[in-house]
Amino acid sequence: MQETRLISKSLLRKSFSSVASPIKPKWLKIKLPSSKTLETKKIVNRQNLTTVCEEALCPNLNDCWSNKHATFMILGDVCTRSCSFCNIQTGKPKSVDKFEPLKVAKAVKDLELKHVVITSVDRDDLPDGGALHFYKTIKMIKKFSPNISIEILTPDFKNKENYLEIISSCAINVFNHNLETVKNLYDIIRPGANYLHSLSLLKSIKNTNKNILTKSGIMVGLGEQLIEIKELFNDLRSSNVDFLTIGQYLRPSLNHYPVIEYYDQDYFDFLKKIAIEMGFKAVTSSPFARSSYKSAEEHEIVKSKMNH
């Protein structure tokens, strides 16, 4: 296993563009669009919706969309935070679209989905961080598709009112909130977020509604050490998190945080083995794994385990 290349945080703060990433391996290739991918795009565009698949430049877009899997991003496409790894634009968001829950529900029905993932940008400008809009969207989806399973991937609702009561009362199967990286890198990778608060959010959701499965995801290749990854795994299990996704960080542009290291599938298999041994019910671990990638399959795996 290669030794991780370390770069000082003070240098990174001055200018991300001045720090080069290692050459991307040839095996990190993305599939070309198919006709089924374009069909999904047509349905999404018909309702004038946003997907995190497009906004975050997800490497699995063509794979997921060709199978009619999409992660809908509600509450607009402008985030109030500016995380150094993320491609979503930051600034002052527009007002909330009150018709968005209906639009999402119609798209989900048109796609004939059995499982859907709903996420959002951070909305620090809203009193509840957008929690009530999540609730309304989920309620409308259930009205149009009563038998669907739903996963939500939420921001941290830091310093927001009544979010816990609202979110835990949603008719969801999986609550997902990503830690993204190890505690030591939070101040530069996730400025504005707090590692302990994110853990507390995951634990509180589980404690409030034990029927909801909880999930989190991380990226590797940011300069984290193995001992820090193990500590993160332990923190998640101590918070009773059920699912885990582990993926390779891919730099969206030169203005974003650089890739410190690329890892092959052997390393991801190694991390998965550690995570499974720690007690996670399902782990998706590969260079292209993202938080909502194969979420339907994960949900079925855990349901099967719980029924036996």
Name these PLM-found stretches.
Residues D63-S66, S84, I88-G91:
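Short functional micro-motifs and their immediate structural scaffolds
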Residues N87-K103, D110-E161, I167-L201, K215, ...:
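Core AdoMet radical
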Residues V78-T80, K92, K158, E224:
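Residues that cap or initiate secondary-structure elements
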Residues M1-T71, L75, L102-K106, K136-I148, ...:
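Auxiliary Fe-S-binding modules of radical SAM enzymes
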